[in-house]
């Protein structure tokens, strides 16, 4: 064999090996990307956003469906989040097909916008081990299981309460819940962002853990409904 011919064979062999290895690596990466994340969780965090305070924030001003004048909305469902016992729960656990219009129409009474419904399904619902239909049925059932005192949900004037006072009012309105089932979250300006209720996967109430979060301010403000 001529020297030049052997060199060409050697180069061709090396290139073939590189192509095969690259193809196998690409297939491996593609397979790993398609594998859903671990969706195990300890409990649900039912998050209820306080609309008047959300609507006073820059992001809320841009949302007329929730924040338009005359809407008279108090607490609305932000989401039902799978939660870890000692850490945040899983998110974005798999491919999220668009939520059907029939599910959206059943859920708009609870979650005020279609875009938020789609977002909650993609980010949190895919980690619930439920179909979209069953997940949003669970969202509605969870919300219906919780009573919000009228002086919190529809205050006629601005309220200032400590996080503990907000949680105590919720506990009093839901005597079958442990007092530790409630948490508050707040904006940096001191307005109430949301209340969080801890529920087992079967929706029975339970005590929250530190992973549920807690407002660290001494007082939170609730604006009157509009």
Indicate where each model-derived feature is located:
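Hydrophobic alpha-helical segments
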Residues: 21-22, 36, 61, 93
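Hydrophobic helical h-region of N-terminal Sec-dependent signal peptides
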Residues: 6, 10-20
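Sterically constrained small-residue positions within well-ordered secondary structures
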Residues: 17, 37, 186-188
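Boundary at the C-terminal end of the N-terminal hydrophobic targeting segment
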Residues: 24-28
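Aromatic-lined ligand-binding clefts that engage carbohydrates, nucleic acids, or primary amines
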Residues: 30-55, 62-66, 108
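Domain-level detector of nuclease and nuclease-like folds
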Residues: 47, 59-226
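N-terminal secretory signal peptides that target proteins for export/translocation
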Residues: 1-5
């Amino acid at each position: 064999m001529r020297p030049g011919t052997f060199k060409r064979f050697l180069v061709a062999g090396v290139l073939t090996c590189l192509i095969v290895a690259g193809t196998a690596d690409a297939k491996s990466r593609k397979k790993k990307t398609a594998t859903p994340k671990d969706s195990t969780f300890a409990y649900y965090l039912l998050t209820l956003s306080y609309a008047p305070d959300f609507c006073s924030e820059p992001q809320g001003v841009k949302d007329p469906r929730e924040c338009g004048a005359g809407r008279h909305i108090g607490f609305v469902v932000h989401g039902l989040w799978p939660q870890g016992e000692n850490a945040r729960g899983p998110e974005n656990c798999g491919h999220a097909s668009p939520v059907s219009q029939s599910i959206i129409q059943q859920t708009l009474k609870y979650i005020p916008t279609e875009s938020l419904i789609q977002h909650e399904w993609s980010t949190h619902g895919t980690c619930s081990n439920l179909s979209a239909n069953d997940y949003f049925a669970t969202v509605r059932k969870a919300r219906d299981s919780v009573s919000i005192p009228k002086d919190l949900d529809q205050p006629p004037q601005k309220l200032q309460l400590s996080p503990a006072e907000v949680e105590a009012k919720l506990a009093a309105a839901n005597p079958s819940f442990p007092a530790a089932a409630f948490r508050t979250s707040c904006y940096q300006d001191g307005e109430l962002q949301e209340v969080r209720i801890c529920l087992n996967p079967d929706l029975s109430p339970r005590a929250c853990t530190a992973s549920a979060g807690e407002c660290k301010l001494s007082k939170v403000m609730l604006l009157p409904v509009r």
